[in-house]
Amino acid sequence: MRRLVPNLIWIACGTAAVVGLGVVALKRGESISAAWVLTAAVCSYLVAFRFYSKIIAAKVFALDATRRTPSERLNDGRDYCPTNRWIVFGHHFAAIAGPGPLVGPTLAAQFGYLPGAIWIIVGVALGGAVQDFVILASSVRRNGKTLGQMAKEEIGTVAGYTALVAVLGIMIVLIAVLALVVVNALGESPWGIVTVGLTIPIALLMGAYMRWFRPEKVLEATAIGIVLLIVALYAGRWVAEHPVYGPMFTLQRTTLAWAIMIYGFAASVLPVWLLLAPRDYLSAFVKIGVVIALALGIVIVLPPLHMPAVTQFVDGSGPVFAGKVFPFAFITIACGAISGFHALISSGTTPKILQREPDARFIGYGGMLMESLVATLALIAACALTPGEYFAINAPAAALGTTVESAAEAIRNWGFTLDPAQFNALTQQVGEQRLLSRTGGAPSLAVGMATIFSNAFSGSGALALWYHFAIMFEALFILTTLDAGTRVGRFMLQDLLKHAWAPLGRISWYPAVVITSAMFVAMWGYFLYQGVTDPLGGINSLWPLFGIANQLLASVALCVGTTVIIKMGKARFAWLTLVPLAWLVSVTMTAGYQKIFSPEPRLGFLSHARIFTDALAEGRIPAGAASADAARQIIFNDRLDAAVAAFFMLAVIVILAASAREWWTILSGRKAAVSTEVPYEPALAAAMLRADSLGTVVATEPARRTRRLAPRALFGAIGSAVHVIIGAPDWRRYANAIRSMPRRLDAGGAEVLATPTEFAAERLAARYSKPGSRCC
């Protein structure tokens, strides 16, 4: 009977997912409620996490709570540091949830809501979440090694070096694009600059609070951070409206670009517990809070999806971007379903701070499901706009003209309608001077979110407030990915440079950390500055490569994941990664080939460059270029795009071929499967500690934790306050401290717990020693 109720709940959840997907896929001829898409997504995520992720956790990796993690084994207080699972989840989610799940589904809405909804829901359960989980678990078992290191050790030297160079190049492109999006979102916006900027000192305060003043008091630090964040939101609005401070914090895009470079460098060299983890944890509260509020708003408003299920633009004639629904819907959505960038975070910062192995399931698989929910909500917000409003905001001026009237005529020719008067009124209501041809996805998403929020919570009078809040939310969403990405890029650069000079690869040598951080920031910072100062060159020309590079990186990660599973002797489970790998390779290679060689100038890099070259040869300036020099710059950029795309594709082909060869030699018995996992070591926190009334240490297994009753929790809080006031030894703080600190050795060399007397003497002495001492 005890199992009957849970089973019935899961059956109902699965049924709701199937019904929701059926309605989304089969209903035609009229708009459907967004509730169907939301129901299908949420129920599918719950079923996938409960059953599909459990196969990976139990059958493939057999995650063990008693196994020591890299954060304990290599604890250095900077990069390796045992961290509370909720803070790790917050950091991980904040790091992976960048512009992809917001902008990608918004742009892909030009195909209709159906292709995007199906791919986001199915793709994440079978592909994206699997990749993140497998790479995270693999890295944890290998002392937190990066994706490039694992490729070298698991697949081979050639594939490893190819992966290191290719992944580093892809990372430079990805981080520069992320930084450019932040600059465009915050440029000349004092509200956003002040609010986002204040999250940095707030994070420093939280990090110091949990490190020195109240270790492991996560809830207290969280409450302080949330209160200060609310203050920061209102402070940003106050500064923006102030006649003196408003212009003072209205920064130019070039100034903001330098500021972002400085921040990226600081986030890479400072200890992870001081800035990166608490700031991402704080940002995760904003992200998750807004996501929950948006989902709640959709449930309250139940907006109809005005965009058709499938539009005529599936043939590749779309005005927002060129390309057919296959493969470009999957390339454009990117992070909403699967993202190669996540593999860098899952093998970068996250495995180095994970405290318990079983948390990898919740953080790796669950974190990706949460990001997919963000993509679903972004798709709903975009499709809740009328098609006329959507295309008026997202289509370029070349397709719409420069006036609302010309845009209405162009949209009418596409089979949709736009009322110029209503569109002008919408522009005024959101507090913008212009919404027409605000391409990129972010403005239209902000309009959709603001409309849902205002209808659900405040009324149309606060539309401008909600719009600017959404813009700030998008900028905050992206910036957290930039700082974690910079740190991961530093790890990768150290992996590469250690072959030239070994000390540069030592993460424990601080000069190497500073040097490689400065080098990596200079790499993406150069392209960022070029993109900010020259709209025709720099990173702007590399934007079309963002989706392709990201998905090719996911292919590399799945190759590594498949190899790890086979070498573990679990080849019967290799289909978990082989299925998404096969699909992803077919999609990305098709998209890359079309972007390079397509004869359609709107799609192919080389054909577009040829049009401009022929025009210059005839002595005329081609359409779309302001001068002959600008035309030459566009030609260079197109050819650079083609060369970079070809290099990335070739690198992935090399890695895929090397992986297939490794799989064949192992499965055919020609080569023994040698695992590179770190041998099992018992975790320092394998046995939870508690103290009885006399202070005697009692070991209890983790699985036998008991819930505190309310009175006991109250007495515990009072006791903690007394400890702080009178300075008495705090046994719980000691128990938390020894999870990451070596215990003393007895005469035989075995680790033993300190006695209560030793503990009290040490704890009292620590009160008068420097901050950061053991048990402090």
Regions found by a protein language model. Give the residues of each.
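Extracellular/periplasmic helix-exit of transmembrane alpha-helices
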Residues: 298-314, 369-447, 484, 529-534
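Membrane-interface "cap" regions at the ends of multi-pass membrane proteins
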Residues: 1-14, 47-102, 284, 323-324, ...
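Flexible loop linkers connecting adjacent transmembrane helices
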Residues: 53-81, 107, 121, 130-159, ...
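Loop-to-transmembrane helix boundary motifs in multi-pass membrane proteins
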Residues: 154-172, 366-373, 439-441, 459-470, ...
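Polybasic interaction patches
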Residues: 711-776
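Membrane-interface helix-loop-helix modules in multi-pass membrane proteins
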Residues: 22-28, 33, 79-142, 153-157, ...
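Transmembrane helix-loop junctions in multi-pass membrane proteins
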Residues: 18-31, 102, 114, 172-188, ...
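Extracellular loop-to-transmembrane helix junctions
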Residues: 30-50, 108-138, 148, 191-203, ...
